[in-house]
Amino acid sequence: MKNVFKTLAVLLTLFSLTGCGLKGPLYFPPADKNAPPPTKKVDSQTQSTMPDKNDRATGDGPSQVNY
């Protein structure tokens, strides 16, 4: 009898936890045909991989950048 309760408890826990990973609404309404498509502004600035100056060194202390 103890094995039945343990098995049912494990199954109930597993079934209840499977819903935890689901995200978003359970019902997806039809898309609005009159709505404009979503746009996102793209920032085209590129960042160099080598820093211009290392601000971590104080005075003649060690620096992480070879000049």
From Swiss-Prot:
It is a lipid-anchor. The keyword Ligase does not apply. Residues 26-67 are annotated as: Disordered. Residues 1-19 form the signal peptide. InterPro entries: LptM_cons. A lipid is attached at residue 20 (S-diacylglycerol cysteine). GO terms for cellular component: cell outer membrane. Interacts with the outer membrane embedded portion of the LPS translocon formed by LptD and LptE (LptDE). Component of the lipopolysaccharide (LPS) transport (Lpt) pathway that promotes efficient assembly of the outer membrane LPS translocon (LptDE) by the BAM complex. Facilitates oxidative maturation of LptD by stabilizing a conformation of the LPS translocon in which LptD can efficiently acquire native disulfide bonds, thereby activating the LPS translocon. NCBIfam families: SS_mature_LptM (NF047847). Belongs to the LptM family. This is LPS-assembly lipoprotein LptM. It comes from Salmonella typhimurium (strain LT2 / SGSC1412 / ATCC 700720). The lineage of its organism: Bacteria, Pseudomonadati, Pseudomonadota, Gammaproteobacteria, Enterobacterales. The gene is lptM.
